[in-house]
């Protein structure tokens, strides 16, 4: 009886939208957040049908991440839907393109050219069984294997030129009266989604949610806000014709994590982060030379890139720095005590200027 080798079925590659690639963790569709360091702790990018929550403190650093998120979407021909905010003026404040190319693209290109081919591959080949010699060598996908054009670098000192072909929409404000204050917001979103072509990537941006500047007092009540979050979460996860992702910021100084609104928001969210700024002291030419605060991870949609567990505590203490060109997240280390060292140096170099104690009784 003869046996025939069973060949693997050939599967046609799926056509991904622009700015979307497969995750190396579970092959989900992910897209860039606009910040390469933020993408690293998101295991390459934001998964589709995700709701990200950023809890901001007294400083408005969370708006930088939201602007990077929206600017990246416009550069990738994605559709932007802006929640209750200052309106179309918000799009004029988006960061523009940076003159410096992205580090990821440079590193990928350098890695491809810096490793020359081996002169004698027969000497370096591992001696294994003959039946395994023809097996193709596969490389595990890493975060460095980023396709060109997946992410862009932006400059906060410049403004993005919003072209006529860029599609975006602005939501109206919630009502101050009525049984459902968020009815015009949901109607605006569903009407906008119905006009999009199937397969479009739509990014939802909700800056300073629950802020009294954009939301009425009635809209901040738990019974209305929880209903709105449930409706928004179901739209993000159940809409099949359009790929939705949402990023919102919440002022933690007005609504703590213990209140009912934030409790349900974190439970329904795919990822939760919080920013805790430091008091800024040292600056050089108007630029901050130290981390601006702590960046804490409370919840993640995927496991961390350096572990196989979806445990946010594995990241350790992180800090963030906002410069002219990027929002950087890196491990936080306590700085040296420069003030005490300067005082000791001054006292050693200038002994005459030290105050002389009186010895008279």
UniProtKB/Swiss-Prot annotation:
Annotated keywords: Cytoplasm, Nucleus, tRNA processing
Listed GO biological process terms: regulation of cytoplasmic translational fidelity; tRNA wobble base 5-methoxycarbonylmethyl-2-thiouridinylation; tRNA wobble uridine modification
Pathway: tRNA modification; 5-methoxycarbonylmethyl-2-thiouridine-tRNA biosynthesis
Record's compositionally biased regions (Polar residues): 104-121, 346-355
UniProt-listed InterPro entries: Elongator_complex_protein_4 (IPR008728), P-loop_NTPase (IPR027417)
Entry GO CC: cytoplasm; cytosol; elongator holoenzyme complex; nucleus; transcription elongation factor complex
Entry annotated with the keyword tRNA processing: yes
Region (Disordered): 93-124, 338-361
Subcellular location: Cytoplasm; Nucleus
Pfam family, one: PAXNEB
Gene3D superfamilies, per database record: P-loop containing nucleotide triphosphate hydrolases
Oligomeric form and interacting partners: Component of the elongator complex.
Function description: Component of the elongator complex, a multiprotein complex which is required for multiple tRNA modifications, including mcm5U (5-methoxycarbonylmethyl uridine), mcm5s2U (5-methoxycarbonylmethyl-2-thiouridine), and ncm5U (5-carbamoylmethyl uridine). The elongator complex catalyzes formation of carboxymethyluridine in the wobble base at position 34 in tRNAs.
Family: Belongs to the ELP4 family.
UniProt protein name: Elongator complex protein 4
Native source species: Schizosaccharomyces pombe (strain 972 / ATCC 24843) (Fission yeast)
Phylogenetic classification of the source organism: Eukaryota, Fungi, Dikarya, Ascomycota, Taphrinomycotina
Gene assigned in the entry: elp4
């Amino acid at each position: 009886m003869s046996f025939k080798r069973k060949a693997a079925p050939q599967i046609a590659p799926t056509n991904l939208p622009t700015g979307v690639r497969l995750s190396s963790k579970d092959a989900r569709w992910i897209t860039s957040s606009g910040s390469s360091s933020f993408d690293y702790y998101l295991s390459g990018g934001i998964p589709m049908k995700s709701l990200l929550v950023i809890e901001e403190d007294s400083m408005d650093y969370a708006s930088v991440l939201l602007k990077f998120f929206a600017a990246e979407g416009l550069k990738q021909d994605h559709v932007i839907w802006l929640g209750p905010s200052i309106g179309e003026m918000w799009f004029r404040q988006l960061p523009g393109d940076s003159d410096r190319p992205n580090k990821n693209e440079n590193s990928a290109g350098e890695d491809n050219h810096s490793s020359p081919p081996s002169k004698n591959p027969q000497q370096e080949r591992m001696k294994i069984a003959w039946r395994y010699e023809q097996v193709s060598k596969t490389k595990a996908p890493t975060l460095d294997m980023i396709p060109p054009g997946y992410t862009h670098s932006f400059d906060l000192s410049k403004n993005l030129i919003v072209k006529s072909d860029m599609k975006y929409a602005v939501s109206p404000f919630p009502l101050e009266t009525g049984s459902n204050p968020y009815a015009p917001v949901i109607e605006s979103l569903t009407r906008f989604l119905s006009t999009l072509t199937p397969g479009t990537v739509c990014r939802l941006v909700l800056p300073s949610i629950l802020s009294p500047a954009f939301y009425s007092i009635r809209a901040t009540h738990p019974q209305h806000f929880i209903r709105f979050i449930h409706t928004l979460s179901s739209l993000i996860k159940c809409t099949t014709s359009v790929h939705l992702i949402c990023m919102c910021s919440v002022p933690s100084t007005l609504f703590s994590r213990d209140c009912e609104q934030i409790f349900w928001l974190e439970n329904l969210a795919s990822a939760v982060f919080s920013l805790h700024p430091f008091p800024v002291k040292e600056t050089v030419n108007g630029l901050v030379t130290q981390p601006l605060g702590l960046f804490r991870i409370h919840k993640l949609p995927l496991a961390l890139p350096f572990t196989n567990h979806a445990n946010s505590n594995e990241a350790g203490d992180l800090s963030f720095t906002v410069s002219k060109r990027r929002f950087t997240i890196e491990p936080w280390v306590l700085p040296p005590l420069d003030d005490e060292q300067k005082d000791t140096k001054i006292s050693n170099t200038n002994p005459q200027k030290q105050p002389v104690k009186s010895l008279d009784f």
